[in-house]
Amino acid sequence: MRYALLIYNDSEVLERRPEEEQRRINNGIYEVLERPNVAGWLRLRNVEASTTVRYEQGRTLLTDGPFIDSKDYLGGFVLVESDNLDGAIAIAGELQELRAAAAIEIRPVLEENLVAA
């Protein structure tokens, strides 16, 4: 089964983090991402580069920035292959021990194809 680890960052923490500490964290993250059960990963640009699209009252609306105003923002995701949730939790736990994120949300990936009506 596949699990998506949604990585949430705190921009204030990242801005204050010393460069040497960030390098240490990045090296640890890289080791985790190189494992055979990590099927893929993506980093996202900062929230200032985001645009939110909504549909309200028959109109498409665009706004700058994230959907929710929060200090934590979605910074990327890791796709993990595991027999069960415990395997995904173990990888998320390792990333948290590195202090790689403010929070990591784990979600099972739907393996079904989208079927049109």
Could you tell me what each predicted segment is?
Residues 1-117:
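Conserved, structured core segments of small domains
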